[in-house]
């Protein structure tokens, strides 16, 4: 399930040996598991503070704690040690962390959520923004809510029409319209 190369094990054991705290473990989590925005995160942890959903894996010099709910996403993953221009660094390859694109026969809502997460939100994130699906009407109107830097942004109309709506309609021609229900009067976080 979760493989650590021999070089990475030695490097990690050395990192643990350098810590002042001796009751540390390595917690492996996945933010947004199963979505295109999934990120695997390593953190030192105090095992006694972890919930019972974490399973312990023992290695020479350190222990790893993984949330059982993430096992499926960490299947076939590997932690390796790589040399870089700034020294050594741990690299994790987790081919199942992001889940799979919905099948052709999946519900439209599921497919739209995937496209928003995989293709649209990463572009908006460069301005601190995001968009989320609120719902789909019976007439197949897609209802969206923008947030972060997109909420109150002066360019949100063109972002909606030329970016988001164009991408969604190109992928899903059955969509009649794409509507924004965001309260753009709030410009506290707007990208300007």
UniProtKB/Swiss-Prot annotation:
Pfam families reported in the protein's UniProt record: NifU (PF01106)
One GO MF term: iron ion binding
Domain of life: Bacteria
One GO biological process term: protein maturation
Cross-referenced SUPFAM superfamilies: Fe-S cluster assembly (FSCA) domain-like, HesB-like domain
Required co-factors: [4Fe-4S] cluster
Record-listed [4Fe-4S] cluster binding positions: 150, 153
Oligomer status and interactors: Homodimer.
Cited HAMAP family: Fe_S_biogen_NfuA
Role description: Involved in iron-sulfur cluster biogenesis. Binds a 4Fe-4S cluster, can transfer this cluster to apoproteins, and thereby intervenes in the maturation of Fe/S proteins. Could also act as a scaffold/chaperone for damaged Fe/S proteins.
This protein's name: Fe/S biogenesis protein NfuA
